[in-house]
Amino acid sequence: MVCGEDMEGNLTKGPILKTLTKLAIPIMASSFLGTLYNLTDMAWIGLLGSKAVAGVGVGGMYTWLSQGLASMARMGGQVQVAQCIGKGNRDEANKYAQTAVQLATLMGLVYAAIVLLFLHRLIGFFHLDDAEAIAAALSYTRIACGLIVFSFLTFTLTGIYTAQGDSKTPFIANLIGLVINMILDPVLILGPGPLPELGVAGAAIATVTAQGIVMSVMIIGIFVQKKDNVLKGIRLFARIPMEYVSGICKIGIPTALQGMAYCVISMVLARMVSVFGAEAVAVQRVGGQIESLSWNTADGFAAALNVFVGQNYGANKMDRVKKGYRASLWTVGIWGLIITAIFVFVPKPIARIFFHEATAIEIAVDYLIIVGLSEAFMCVELMTVGALSGLGKTHLCSVISIIFTGARIPLAILLCRTALGLNGIWCAVSSTSIVKGIIFVATFFWITRSSRILKDNSRL
């Protein structure tokens, strides 16, 4: 229950695999719920046709971009809070938590204002040539990004809860939000009976309503929990202390740059994909959501490992850090291989769930097979980024990720001009994911073999 969660969240003691799994399972379940959020939207929107899906796909790029920005407050706050708890300094943890929430609120409001101000130019970037798709993109983005502050706060509160070893409260909140979203989607999108059919606007309204409810549940959880919570007593409208902003930015800015760069690169690729028609854009959007069965799960496990590493690093227990990483490597790697097998061997039944036009199904099948080959590597990459970030090595993660993700653009330009055509873009994405997975794993083992990691920690 929300009110009964143990907020002590000490991850520096006890059996490693059991401790890590206990924290990871609710996070992974929450990630699955996030996937179901998006898949539910896409399944209902798919009934409106590929043009509506393409429009939502374009609008979704800007909600995705916002997550990169939001990760500054979330990752910076999560890592700093976890390390403070590992050191036994809960007062500092409280101050970092308050600052993270304040930054999330401010950035969410500013981002919404910018998107609304430049909405037509932002949608025009993708050069959609269909009036219906453009209208859908404008309608969805106006609502989804206009109230994006709910998402920013939910994202950051989840990180702070997780940093304390409480992954159950965010799971319960997300479960409630999913139920609300699943109820509202068909009602608002299709307008059964006397209700008006709102189409893609209905999908956006359902999403932001669910996000607002998730945020509210987590806020309520702060006050009803019996154990200590570093979020208790925070003052949203107090002066933002710059010394804690600096600590959060030191960890969070590289992560934010990495996330936003990844999204911008994906936008460029989406623009290249748009040359092949609305069906191709729709497949990229829906394909990414289907693929989130692996990356959302890996990202959830990465969040658990991030906190585990952060607390144990703060307590100078590097042996637990290494053992926790190895256990996670096996777990996430096997999951990625399972997803690869599903995508490669049964792509058509999956594609038919979301598409009803022959051309779109054919494109989706190719996407799933090609991208599916890299799923295990992508899962391992995301998990390792979580571990390295827990050590405070977000700068290194950012550099590696931006360089090799950025390589997708020239590689895609080269390959799509060959006989591969559209599949050349999918090949560029898949091949770079494989390379990143290998490099990140090698980097983690290289970093943790060095005695410098403990010297760095002693100066924190």
List the model feature ranges, each with a label:
Residues 50-61, 137, 141, 204, ...:
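Small-residue hotspots at the loop-to-helix junctions and early N-terminal turns
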Residues 32, 36-54, 123-131, 187-198, ...:
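Helix-terminus/linker motif at the lipid-water interface of multi-pass membrane proteins
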Residues 53-113, 151-170, 270, 283-347, ...:
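Small-residue-rich hydrophobic transmembrane alpha-helices
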Residues 1-24, 81-149, 195-253, 309-374, ...:
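Short alpha-helical transmembrane segments in multi-pass integral membrane proteins
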Residues 71-74, 144-162, 170-178, 203-218, ...:
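Short runs within selected transmembrane alpha-helices of multi-pass transporters and secretion channels
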Residues 13, 17-36, 40, 62-69, ...:
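Residue-level signal for short hydrophobic patches within transmembrane helices
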